[in-house]
């Protein structure tokens, strides 16, 4: 081969090598261009999606804000209506309270006028006729004396109250009261003539009898002795004399087989040991009833209780015993004691003082005070009073 041919061959080989090398480079560039296009498309898609999402979110937020604004507007409207309703109710209450306050002021003015009238009357009584108070005091004391006399039968306290009433009339130094004072003196004299009863003493005696009940001795039917209580002959203790002892015992038995006793009075009934306790307690209870009847002035109850005590003691206890005799004597004396007093039915001075109170004190209080008007304020018109406020507010 020539040198020219060799050179041509080298050139062809070089071209082939260059062509072979340029083909991968073009392929690589084409692949890079495709990747860039894909990435651009993805970026554009992402941007479009983000824009669409952002637009939708903004639109939803706008819708939510619109709904919230509408709800707030509705609430505000409701609050305004409620406020207006409460305002109207408060205005009604204020008007009602104002009317009530006005009426209360009118009533207060009326009461103030009445109080002024009373004060003027009191000033008139205390200034012009101060002695009238002494007359009222005497009238009260006489009425209290009558209450003590007829309710409590306390003659001593009633007489003391009448003396105090007479002293009050004496302090008035009024000659026109001589008749009343004379009546009070007569009432005191009539009370002094009343025979008083020692109620406390009677009650103490009844209590003493109650304490002596346990000392009473029960009646014994065999207290007069029995033929079996004493033997005419004593038995021997010797065994050898058994025949004689047997004969004596038989003789005593035959002598006492039939016994005849003579009694001039009725037999006293015997009590069992457990019944004795009940009898004593019954006697104490009747004595207590009699003691309670004394301050109550229950004459029939008092005498009936003591009669029961006397009957039971005479029936079941030994009347020959000294303690029983003293007990019965005290019961008989107390049963004859009068526990009610012969009191006057009326007090002469009471009616006289009542008449004086009518003419002097009560007529003076009934007179209108000077400087006061008889005109009374007109009642408040009903139209000024609004309807009552609801109770639930």
From Swiss-Prot:
Q: Which UniProt keywords apply?
A: Cell inner membrane, Cell membrane, Membrane, Transmembrane, Transmembrane helix
The residues that cross the membrane are 37-57
What are the leading ranks of the lineage? Bacteria, Pseudomonadati, Pseudomonadota, Gammaproteobacteria, Enterobacterales
Further information in the entry reads:
Was suggested to be a uroporphyrinogen-III methyltransferase, but the function of the protein has not been experimentally determined.
Q: Which Pfam families match?
A: HemX
What ranges does the record give for the region Disordered, renumbered to this chain?
Answer: 1-30, 366-393
Low complexity bias: where? 375-393
Q: Which GO terms describe its cellular component?
A: plasma membrane
Major site of localization recorded for this protein: membrane
Q: How does it assemble?
A: Homooligomer, possibly a homopentamer.
Tell me yes or no: is DNA-binding among this UniProt entry's keywords: no
Feature: compositional bias, Basic and acidic residues:
1-18
The molecule here is called Protein HemX
Name where it's found: Cell inner membrane
Task: Give the record's membrane topology.
Answer: Single-pass membrane protein
